[in-house]
C-alpha cells in the first residue's frame, strides 16, 4: 500500500526547517492538504504559504485543527504542545524520515549520505538528471540556486534525496541507488560511538536492493574500509585513489573553478584481462575545491550508469548554479570577495579554506562562528588545527543552538588553541558589530573573506559588503 491520495490535512511541527519544508513542498505539489507551525517566520515558511500551506507561528494545541497525521523532526521535544495534543487525540505521529520514505516509494530513488558534502552532491545529481531529461523529483537539505528552493516535483520516474544520518533515521529510506561521500565522527549525541556510525552506514548500503548499486568514495579511509565489508551488493567506487572505478584526475582549481577529467574503469568488460578504461574529459564546474570535484565525480557516476552521454554531463556541470550557503559569494569590497559557507565541522572548514586558498593569490580571512558547545568541545583539537589554509582567523562567540555553555569550549579558548597549534594570526571577535571595522583593517584587493558556520553568521556575511561600503563616521 502506498501513500493514499485522500489523506486529510498533514500537519508539520517545525515546517520551516530545511528538511521538513522540502517534504512539505513536494506534498503540496502532489495535491495534498499541508499545514503546520514554526517558532518563527522564515523564507521557507513564506514560500510554502505562497504554495497554499496554512502555517501558524508559535506552537499551540489548537494549530492541529482537523489534522489527519502529524509529522515531526527529531528537533521537536516530547513536551511540544502540538505533539502532546496529537497523542491525546491518538493521531498518527510520524518522523520526518518516515514521511520522506513514503514519498520515495512513489519513485525510483537516489539517496545521498555522508558526514559532509550531501547537499552539494544531491544538487549535482539533480542537475545532471535534469539535463539528462529524467525530470527528477528532488528533496534536498539546502536551497538549490537554480530552483530557488530545496525541493521540486518532477514528472519523471526518479527522485533524488539527501539522506540525513544525524538521528539514524536514514536507514528507513528505500533507496535504489545510494551514495556515501565520507564518514567522520559526528552526531555522537545520538550514536554514542564512532563504531555505531560505521554500522549505520553499512546497514544503509546493505538496504539497497540487488538491482541497485552504491557509489562510494575510496579516498576516505573509513569508506574504503566499509567497501571491504560489503558483500552481495554492487559497489562503484570513486575518488583520486588509483584503485577507484571512477578516478578523478588532472584537477585544476585555479580561478574559483574546478577543472578535471574522470577515468572510467569498466570492471565487467575487463574480466580476465586488463580493465577497460575510457576518459570523460574537459569537465568544468563553477565551484572551487577538490571536495566539490569529488562530489561531481559521485554525481557523474550515477549519471553514466543511468545512460547519460558525456556531452550532456559536461554541459550540465558547466551550468551548475551551486547551493545556497556553500561557498556563496555575497559581495565585494575594495577588491576583496566575501563568501558565506555552512561549514561547521573541522573537515568541512578545512575543505572550504583549501578551496579558497587554491582560488586566490591574496589572503584568506576566515570568520568562524562555532556551532554548538558540544561539537566544539568534542572536536576541540580538530577545530584548533583545521584553519591552516587561512592567513587570518577571526573567532566569534559559539552559536549555542539551545545548548548550555561548556567550560573551555568558547572563542577565547579556541583562539588560544589556534595559536598554540602554530597559527600565526588568530583573534576573537568581541561583537558582531565590530566585524566591518576589523575586515577594513585586514582585507586587501584579491583577498577572500570566508564566513563559516551553521548559525546566524550567514546574516553577517550578507550584511558585510554593504557595511564595508558605507561611509565610515569620524567617531569610529
UniProtKB/Swiss-Prot annotation:
It is an enzyme of class 6 (ligase). One of its GO terms (biological process) is cell wall organization. Pathway: Cell wall biogenesis; peptidoglycan biosynthesis. Its EC number is 6.3.2.8. GO terms for cellular component: cytoplasm. ATP binds at residues 114-120. SUPFAM superfamilies: MurCD N-terminal domain (SSF51984), MurD-like peptide ligases, catalytic domain (SSF53623), MurD-like peptide ligases, peptide-binding domain (SSF53244). It is found in: Cytoplasm. Keywords: ATP-binding, Cell cycle, Cell division, Cell shape, Cell wall biogenesis/degradation, Cytoplasm, Ligase, Nucleotide-binding, Peptidoglycan synthesis. GO terms for molecular function: ATP binding; UDP-N-acetylmuramate-L-alanine ligase activity. InterPro entries: Mur-like_cat_sf (IPR036565), Mur_ligase_C (IPR004101), Mur_ligase_C_dom_sf (IPR036615), Mur_ligase_cen (IPR013221), Mur_ligase_N (IPR000713), MurCDEF_pg_biosynth (IPR050061), UDP-N-AcMur_Ala_ligase_MurC (IPR005758). Cell wall formation. Belongs to the MurCDEF family. HAMAP family: MurC. This is UDP-N-acetylmuramate--L-alanine ligase. It comes from Beijerinckia indica subsp. indica (strain ATCC 9039 / DSM 1715 / NCIMB 8712). The gene is murC.
Amino acid at each position: 500500500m502506498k501513500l493514499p491520495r485522500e489523506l486529510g490535512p498533514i500537519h508539520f511541527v517545525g515546517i520551516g526547517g530545511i528538511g521538513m519544508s522540502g517534504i512539505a513542498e513536494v506534498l503540496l505539489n502532489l495535491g495534498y492538504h499541508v499545514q503546520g507551525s514554526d517558532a518563527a517566520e522564515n523564507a521557507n515558511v513564506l514560500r510554502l504559504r505562497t504554495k497554499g500551506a496554512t502555517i501558524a507561528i508559535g506552537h499551540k494545541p489548537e494549530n492541529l485543527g482537523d489534522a489527519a497525521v502529524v509529522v515531526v523532526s527529531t528537533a521537536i521535544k516530547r513536551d511540544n504542545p502540538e505533539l502532546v495534543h496529537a497523542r491525546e487525540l491518538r493521531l498518527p505521529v510520524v518522523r520526518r524520515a518516515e514521511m520522506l520514505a513514503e514519498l520515495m516509494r512513489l519513485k525510483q530513488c537516489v539517496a545521498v549520505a555522508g558526514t559532509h558534502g550531501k547537499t552539494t552532491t544531491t544538487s549535482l545529481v539533480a542537475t545532471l538528471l535534469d539535463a539528462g531529461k529524467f525530470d527528477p523529483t528532488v528533496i534536498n537539505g539546502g536551497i538549490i540556486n537554480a530552483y530557488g528552493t530545496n525541493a521540486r516535483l518532477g514528472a519523471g520516474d526518479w527522485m533524488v534525496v539527501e539522506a540525513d544520518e544525524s538521528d539514524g533515521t536514514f536507514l528507513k529510506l528505500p533507496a535504489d541507488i545510494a551514495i556515501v561521500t565520507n564518514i567522520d565522527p559526528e552526531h555522537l549525541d545520538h550514536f554514542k560511538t564512532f563504531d555505531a556510525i560505521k554500522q549505520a552506514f553499512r546497514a544503509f548500503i546493505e538496504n539497497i536492493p540487488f538491482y541497485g548499486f552504491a557509489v562510494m568514495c575510496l579516498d576516505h579511509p573509513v569508506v574504503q574500509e566499509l567497501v571491504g565489508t560489503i558483500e552481495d551488493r554492487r559497489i562503484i567506487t570513486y575518488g583520486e585513489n588509483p584503485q577507484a572505478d571512477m578516478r578523478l584526475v588532472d584537477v585544476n582549481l585555479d580561478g574559483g573553478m574546478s577543472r578535471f577529467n574522470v577515468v572510467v574503469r569498466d570492471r565487467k568488460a575487463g574480466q580476465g584481462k586488463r580493465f577497460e578504461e575510457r576518459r570523460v574529459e574537459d569537465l568544468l564546474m563553477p565551484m572551487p575545491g577538490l571536495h566539490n570535484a569529488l562530489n561531481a565525480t559521485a554525481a557523474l557516476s550515477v549519471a553514466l550508469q543511468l545512460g547519460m552521454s558525456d556531452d550532456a554531463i559536461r554541459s550540465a556541470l558547466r551550468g551548475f548554479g551551486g547551493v545556497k550557503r556553500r561557498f556563496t559569494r555575497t559581495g565585494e569590497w575594495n577588491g576583496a570577495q566575501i563568501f558565506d559557507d555552512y561549514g561547521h565541522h573541522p573537515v568541512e572548514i578545512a575543505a572550504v579554506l583549501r578551496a579558497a586558498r587554491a582560488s586566490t593569490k591574496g589572503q584568506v580571512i576566515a570568520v568562524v562562528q562555532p556551532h554548538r558547545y558540544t561539537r566544539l568541545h568534542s572536536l576541540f583539537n580538530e577545530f584548533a588545527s583545521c584553519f591552516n589554509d587561512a592567513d587570518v582567523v577571526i573567532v566569534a562567540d559559539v552559536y549555542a543552538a539551545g545548548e548550555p555553555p561548556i567550560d573551555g569550549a568558547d572563542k577565547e579558548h579556541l583562539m588560544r588553541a589556534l595559536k598554540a597549534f602554530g597559527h600565526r594570526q588568530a583573534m576573537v571577535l568581541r561583537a558582531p558589530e565590530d566585524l566591518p571595522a576589523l575586515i577594513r583593517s585586514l582585507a586587501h584587493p584579491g583577498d577572500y573573506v570566508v564566513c563559516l558556520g551553521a548559525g546566524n553568521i550567514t546574516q553577517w556575511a550578507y550584511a558585510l559588503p554593504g557595511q564595508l561600503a558605507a561611509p565610515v563616521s569620524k567617531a569610529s
